[in-house]
């Protein structure tokens, strides 16, 4: 038996779309502002088939010309309840959110403010600098404090 492993192509979408729709592990949201898409956020589910779900805030980005206007905060605050609602629809519950970032990245303030995330680990020289792992154990309640 020979199994060929290759990179995914757009032609493969039909073969995997059913699985992706039945169990979406990634959720991508965009921020529209002043007539265009100015940012996005990508949430990735890390829990396999467990009912207690850990999400990773995989990426949040805002176009440079539109930063410092609250778009990043809006992306987190407005998309996370929607993700939690989707989880609840399949009888799953959001347990925590994890996010990693450079130890000197100002985005840590955003993660503390919007998620209640705190640094739980620091990894020396992971990429080009030190990286921190932040965990939010009550992410939906962070803004209610």
What does each model-identified segment do?
Residues 50, 63-77, 103-109, 113:
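Conserved glycine-rich acetyl-CoA-binding loop
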Residues 111-122:
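Conserved acetyl-CoA-binding loop of GNAT-fold acetyltransferases
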Residues 67, 90-108, 124-130, 137:
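Conserved beta-strand-loop-alpha-helix junction that forms the acyl-donor binding cleft
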């Amino acid at each position: 038996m020979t199994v060929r492993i290759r990179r995914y192509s757009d032609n493969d979408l039909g073969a995997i779309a059913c699985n992706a729709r039945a169990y979406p592990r990634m959720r991508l949201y965009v921020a529209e502002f002043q007539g265009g898409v100015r940012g996005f956020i990508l949430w990735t589910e890390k829990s396999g088939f467990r009912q207690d779900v850990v999400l990773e805030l995989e990426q949040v980005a805002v176009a440079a010309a539109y930063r410092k206007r609250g778009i990043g905060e809006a992306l987190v605050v407005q998309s996370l309840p929607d993700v939690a609602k989707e989880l609840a629809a399949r009888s799953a519950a959001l347990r925590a959110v994890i996010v990693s970032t450079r130890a000197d990245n100002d985005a840590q303030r955003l993660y503390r403010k919007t998620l209640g995330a705190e640094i739980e680990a620091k990894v020396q020289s992971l990429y080009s600098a030190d990286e921190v792992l932040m965990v939010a154990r009550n992410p939906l309640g962070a803004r209610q404090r």
